[in-house]
Curated annotation (Swiss-Prot):
Keyword Metal-binding (UniProt): yes
Organism expressing this protein natively: Homo sapiens (Human)
Gene that this sequence comes from: RAB23
Residues recorded as bearing Phosphoserine in the entry: S186, S187
Protein localization: Cell membrane; Cytoplasm; Cytoplasmic vesicle, Autophagosome; Endosome membrane
Known catalytic reactions: GTP + H2O = GDP + phosphate + H(+)
Pfam families per record: Ras
Stated name of the protein: Ras-related protein Rab-23
Regulation: Regulated by guanine nucleotide exchange factors (GEFs) which promote the exchange of bound GDP for free GTP. Regulated by GTPase activating proteins (GAPs) which increase the GTP hydrolysis activity. Inhibited by GDP dissociation inhibitors (GDIs).
Domain text: Switch 1, switch 2 and the interswitch regions are characteristic of Rab GTPases and mediate the interactions with Rab downstream effectors. The switch regions undergo conformational changes upon nucleotide binding which drives interaction with specific sets of effector proteins, with most effectors only binding to GTP-bound Rab.
Alphabetized PANTHER family for the sequence: RAS-RELATED PROTEIN RAB
Length: 237
């Protein structure tokens, strides 16, 4: 475990073509709501949720990035400092599936190889699917990514996506702290680890934690109860 007065915060970016359900996904996860009306994200939206993972307090900061090319310059700036990524395509949108590799390259170009999952959303619309199951599975295998099929509308496997990424990042963080204990004792707190024993702090990314931008945050020391998702995972290792 990390030290008692330390809080973990993870910046996750959710990327993919427009209209694949990125905004709906983080709305569902953070607020428990689903809105079927599509509104194009202009630039970047942000939501957060605090959870517990293996008895550790973890704050997830979810950045929903626009899927249109005209916002590329804006959204790329928000990739910086990301520690995990959700790559999303839609069951009913062939173009979004074919664009996955391009989105992956954009993220890697900005932040390197961070914990990432591939998500096929809208599986409640399988009757209208434009992608064969074996195609999606082959893409996940080629990119060497964990693969989830989700339905934001039915709240299927949404929690599992973010829980998996949080667990993967915690593993990485603990390994880094084991190699360099000073990560938890530096005078400037980092996105990734916060000292919550004082007042409000600023979170600054370190080179080892992918970034160099500063984001002001107010750590929350309240512990949350573990959430149980009634759906079983349909992920592919």
């Amino acid at each position: 475990m990390l030290e008692e007065d330390m809080e973990v915060a993870i910046k996750m970016v959710v990327v993919g073509n427009g209209a694949v359900g990125k905004s709906s996904m983080i709305q569902r996860y953070c607020k428990g709501i689903f809105t079927k009306d599509y509104k194009k994200t202009i630039g970047v939206d942000f939501l957060e949720r605090q959870i517990q993972v293996n008895d550790e307090d973890v704050r997830l900061m979810l950045w929903d990035t626009a899927g249109q090319e005209e916002f590329d310059a804006i959204t790329k700036a928000y990739y910086r400092g990301a520690q995990a990524c959700v790559l999303v395509f839609s069951t009913t949108d062939r173009e979004s599936f074919e664009a996955v590799s391009s989105w992956r390259e954009k993220v890697v170009a900005e932040v390197g190889d961070i914990p990432t999952v591939l998500v096929q959303n809208k599986i409640d619309l399988l009757d209208d699917s434009c992608i064969k199951n074996e195609e999606a599975e082959a893409l996940a295998k080629r990119l060497k990514l964990r693969f989830y099929r989700t339905s934001v509308k039915e709240d299927l496997n949404v929690n599992e996506v973010f829980k998996y990424l949080a667990e993967k990042y915690l593993q990485k963080l603990k390994q880094q702290i084991a190699e360099d204990p000073e990560l938890t004792h530096s005078s400037s707190n980092k996105i990734g680890v916060f000292n919550t024993s004082g007042g409000s702090h600023s979170g600054q990314n370190s080179g080892t934690l992918n970034g160099g931008d500063v984001i002001n945050l107010r750590p929350n020391k309240q512990r949350t109860k573990k959430n149980r998702n009634p759906f079983s995972s349909c992920s592919i290792p």
